[in-house]
Amino acid sequence: MRTLSIVVFLVAACVALPAAADQINLPARKPGQWKIEMLRGTAPAMTIQLCLDTASDKAMMESGLSITSDKCSSVSMTQNGDTITVDAACKFGPMATKSHTVITGDFQSAYTIKTISDLTGGGPLMPKHSETTQNVTWVGECNGLKPGEMMMPGGMKINTLNAMKPMGG
């Protein structure tokens, strides 16, 4: 159960941070399958596959915006060319996080999300400080996934919109 909670938290991070940037006219992502390679500290890389169409991308963005507005006491966003910077202070139940995120890329073929965050109240298994890089690349048409579905390592399929509901999205 603890692993599922961490996965849901990571799913929220994948969706909510780009969604928060939507407030400064972030372009829609290209429909199809996206590969998300998550790198965090010395942990092995985690690769996730995400299938999007126009409707699921919009719904995920709206869900992420809902989480941001409901769970974050402060969000500051700036854009300079193709670089978007987001600073946020958010609370998810007993967990509070402060994060600094830099997003670069075109959202049609690739983008990168680099986040530095500090977490309190997450229990002994949650990292207190983390630096995460998500390298996101478009790989083509969806292969075995429906729009809005995410394939986690080990073959676990998650409907991203359903996963966001417990977090307020």
What are these regions (language model features)?
Residues M1-I6:
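Positively charged n-region of N-terminal signal peptides that target proteins for export
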Residues D22-G169:
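Subset-of-secretome marker
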